């Protein structure tokens, strides 16, 4: 099977496009409250005036946000090469138009033609990048070899890889510590808060959450692999990628005084403990790994219930070197995905374990 034919049969781009589209919809419509009809006489947003106040930064964020969506749609299988750009552009425009229309019923949101244009431009940019990548035989072959050699075959493997990619992508929020699911309660630049004594309970809970998350995600990855001999390298690559994404995001998005907060002492201890637990768990039978992964993932969501200060912590906006309105969308989306991901991943693993003859890695 050639790289092109294998890529064409893969459902991974479709799953990524669907998951990313849901993420865009959530970010565009949250907090899903106070819906009301527009005042009488309000024109449809396409025929209304442009927003009186806008920044180049917000426009750039919209372009960047929709570029991955266009990229994934353009790579969806069974679309003729000549039609990929048109299909991606139509999908991005339709999604953006639907969401901007829905925003007309949310007083906290502003439906804007400028947003639609920026979103469409981002979709087009992503689709063009996908077409350029698809023309590179070397790049297509490299992706196909990794996908086929390392991970489970078929639709199940594609969906698992898509879920793993979504988890890695949301590590881009440095306001949420490494392998955590809630915001860092200490990431505030208020001197009064900075001088307060450390909450031991919050530190313990944060460490336990990170340990559970690392154990669960590591086992999730191990269960996606074809052969056990790939587990060590794959887990190290995953942890290294998460460290890289979180560290770069902290350097770019946080103020210098808050750079270290993405890896506080409690979390670093939890990551170390989770790594040791994972080392002992990768040799267990796969049915046991499924149960242990689900317990660990769900525990990473339930553990913050023990400390309301951690559970209801708000996004630490003062620690970000980013004062634009898109920051609320960014924090809300990444936080929601991190809370929902363990549930979705656990459901996927139980569905995988229920398939007849899913077998053991070689």
Where are the regions a protein language model picked out?
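Long, hydrophobic, well-ordered secondary-structure blocks that form the structural core
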Residues: 117-120
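Bulky hydrophobic segments
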Residues: 1-108, 113, 124-362
